[in-house]
Amino acid sequence: MSRFKVSKFRHMEARPSRREAWISDIRAVTTPTCGNHIKSSCSLIAFNSDRPGVLGVISLEGHEENKRHVTYLGCHSDLVTDLDFSPFDDFLLASGSADRTIKLWRLSGTGEALPSVPGVVLGPEELPVEVLQFHPTVDGVLVSTAGKTVKVWDVAKQQPLTELEAHKDLVQSAVWSRDGAIVGTACKDKQLRIFDPRARTQASQSTQAHENNRDIRLAWTGIQEHLVSTGFNQMREREAKLWDTRLFSSALASVTLDTSPGPLIPLLDPDSGLLVLAGKGENQLYCYEVTPQQPALSPVTQCILENVLRGAALVPRRALAVMSCEVLQVLQLSDTAIIPISHHVPRKAVEFHEDLFPDTAGSVPASDAHMWWAGDNQQVQKVSLNPARRPHPCFTSSLVPTMEPAPDMVQPAEMPRADTDLSEGFSSPSSLMSPSTPSSLGPSLSSTSGIGTSPSQRSLQSLLGPSSKFRHTQGSLLHRDSHITNLKGLNLTTPGESDGFCANRLRVAVPLLSSGGQVAVLELQKPGRLPDTALPTLQNGTAVMDLVWDPFDPHRLAVAGEDARIRLWRVPPGGLENVLTTPETVLTGHTEKIYSLRFHPLAADVLASSSYDLTVRIWDLQTGAERLKLQGHQDQIFSLAWSPDGKQLATVCKDGHVRVYEPRSSPLPLQEGPGPEGGRGARIVWVCDGGCLLVSGFDSRSERQLQLYIADALAQGPSALLGLDVAPSTLLPSYDPDTGLVLLTGKGDTRVFLYEVLPEAPFFLECNSFTSPDPHKGFVLLPKTECDIQDVEFARCLRLRQTSLEPVAFRLPRVRKEFFQDDVFPDTAVTWEPALSAKAWFEGANGQPRLLSLQPPGMTPVSQAPREVPARRAPSSAQYLEEKSDQQKKEELLNAMVAKLGNREDPLPQDSFEGVDEDEWD
């Protein structure tokens, strides 16, 4: 632009919309990622919610008669780092995550259910995915970054076309040029690089971008050779630079803003050349006009925001209100709302202005991935934004097929009410199988899932695959009044084989760091702040290795010591009031320190212990004698677990084997199979009514993983593998046999994974995880009787922090809570009453636990509840008006105006005035 030529945007105004147009009642969160946290197509908005791995989805266009409601899409098992809509298909969304995968989702229109499984999964990568972007001219191509790696994907084949090399540090930005021929990247090594991915994997050009390596972002202008970068200089000032790839040694122009720490998000509209700079954590937007011809970054306007900005996105140009001269619309993501910010150029005439709205790229791709990779450079056909001439082609990408529900799905009376969730909707991510999972495992629903399906539901499941009815699980901390606070001197260095603390329905036992192996006993019925004085303890005289409560006697605690002894303590019914130094019983027999203790699930006074002497010993607590000794381990025993019927005992060992024993039959293992490869630790638990074994451990790359075994076929190896994440602590599984859910977390973690475990494919159904703001030191599951059944609380846990003990409730959102949810709460086993004595069990007897109904008095099961008849909705006034002709609308408008003016035959006020004589005018 010549310096004597004025800009057509010089009078542009940026105004946040009225509160009525805000999308309120959301909960957003900012994560330390390179993404913008919000994206928009011409139909939908997607944004990061405050739940890890969950995106909020809402319609872009609001309707006056209906308030827009946010639906939630459970995408990943970890934070969503970036997301992008297809430039051609408004309902095709790609999401990248810290779980190292990229997923493509076929979203639906307003009011329709979101998918529960992705249409396409790319990866997993070696590191978390940081950035992704669809190709601007081709359907089925996208670029992504993970660590130092940049890949260009053929989505249809689910394979990378190429991998761009030469990056020496974390890649913070990767963007396509407008014609889709080249890719620009910004790296933490301060370098900007230009790639032609179809020609070579090495960068064709590179230059130093900014002097500081913090959060460098890129955006291409409408001219292929020019791009904009944002970052920080050596003085930690935020700056934006304009680059020409033909003269890449230095920037053409630059502008410096301030020293605010929030990284700048560059939002550039290539058609108008307008650049909006939005700072995370700030309350101001800067708008510049990019003029490469001069060259310059010319300031146009600024906008003060009412709320702090957490993310920002541009609304596509085809969705702007062109008749009101809206040249730009920014969506501001705040903590509790999405706020549209319109940029208008004031004009007198209400008409389409060609100078403000040149033709823009349409919604039909120019080619496909195969043609583009072969060298095709066709460009997307441009379309006019003039409403009178604007075409309305509807392109639907074939990458993810659309879901066409069966006709009977639209009949509400046909749908069962037992598994109905909240109307706002919430979709759960699918479980990702490890690459080593057998390929023959096809998706199918287990009969144990407890979901009654109609033919219409089965036809939908054939498209989406199975999903858990617990996928909408909501975990939350209970009120602070139920917390135990002011904990001091906790022992946080208990062995990895121990849970760190133990709890029953009455009290909690926590090892302390003080000498003498002291254990504090806290009463759950007495929450609040503990006194600053020393607590009464159980003094073991040696370091505590593990501890566990007797399931049939809530006052008896078993403690394993480093001195190879097991001490049994009796806690008074009112709680521990004095220091106890003498245990009720001491069990001796192991020759090395003990690692794990497990009480028998059905027989009273039967205890199993594992030791570093490579044996498992089973004790009769009535006589205080060792009765059985199991052998066959070649290395440290990581974990042991009784089967639900108490007949067998399983172990996982550092020698890389899983073993199953029948203790009363033989001291040697009945079965043996391969276990986790890593030797850092493992846990084992019986699942699926004792038909399967679940082992949590590590692979050879130190990735935490789950292995599911058929209990009768250990030698065949695991039936399924599930890789989770990379972390140092072993995942501690807590299994709920009533729901089939396993809760997994590690010491020092902030997240609790939830999976429904099935004995057949797909074996693992992922549910919403629970995330806490700070790490916990332990996490244990309480008995089912502690749950609030009327609030559909199916699990309650205790979370041990460094200074407090907090209860966590896991609930399932349901619409009709006035009914007993019998599909969620089957009859539960009475685990606090023994089924037989120790003597009977050692003599070969077996027992079964008594079952107890959890149905509260006076509540009707939801399976017997009357079905709701959907109310017929009357057509809205807007629909009624659309059916009228223009002439009818005109007549109604005139009649309404006349009715307001009153009767036209009434005399006018001036008719009653007295006139003047003619001669008075002179």
Swiss-Prot record:
Annotated Low complexity bias: 427-456
Repeat region (WD), residues: 75-115, 124-163, 166-205, 209-253, 539-581, 589-629, 632-671, 725-765
SUPFAM superfamilies assigned to the protein according to its UniProt record, in alphabetical order: Quinoprotein alcohol dehydrogenase-like
Key words, A-Z: Actin-binding, Cytoplasm, Cytoplasmic vesicle, Golgi apparatus, Isopeptide bond, Membrane, Phosphoprotein, Protein transport, Repeat, Transport, Ubl conjugation, WD repeat
InterPro entries: Coronin (IPR015505), DUF1899 (IPR015048), G-protein_beta_WD-40_rep (IPR020472), Quinoprotein_ADH-like_sf (IPR011047), WD40/YVTN_repeat-like_dom_sf (IPR015943), WD40_repeat_CS (IPR019775), WD40_rpt (IPR001680)
Keyword Zinc-finger: no
Highest taxon of source: Eukaryota
Keyword field contains DNA-binding: no
Cellular component per GO, a single term: membrane
Biased composition range(s): Basic and acidic residues: 881-893
Crosslink feature (Glycyl lysine isopeptide (Lys-Gly) (interchain with G-Cter in ubiquitin)) location: K469
Disordered as annotated region, ranges: 419-467, 858-922
Annotated GO MF terms: actin binding
Post-translational modification: The membrane-associated form is phosphorylated on tyrosine residues.
GO biological process: one example: establishment of cell polarity
Modified residues (Phosphoserine): S459, S462, S912
Cell compartments where the protein resides: Golgi apparatus membrane; Golgi apparatus, trans-Golgi network; Cytoplasmic vesicle; Cytoplasm, Cytosol
Tissues expressing the protein: In the adult, widely expressed with highest levels in brain, thymus and kidney and low levels in skeletal and heart muscle. Not expressed in lung. In the eye, strongly expressed in the outer plexiform layer of the retina. In the intestine, expressed both in terminally differentiated epithelial cells and in crypt epithelium. In the embryo, strongest expression is seen in brain, thymus, intestine, apical epidermal layers of the skin and developing lens fibers of the eye.
Family in the record: Belongs to the WD repeat coronin family.
Assembly description: Interacts with clathrin adapter AP1 complex. This interaction takes place at Golgi membranes and not AP1-positive endosomal membranes. Interacts (when ubiquitinated at Lys-469) with EPS15.
Function: F-actin regulator involved in anterograde Golgi to endosome transport: upon ubiquitination via 'Lys-33'-linked ubiquitin chains by the BCR(KLHL20) E3 ubiquitin ligase complex, interacts with EPS15 and localizes to the trans-Golgi network, where it promotes actin polymerization, thereby facilitating post-Golgi trafficking. May play a role in the maintenance of the Golgi apparatus morphology.
Name under which the protein is recorded: Coronin-7
Organism, as annotated: Mus musculus
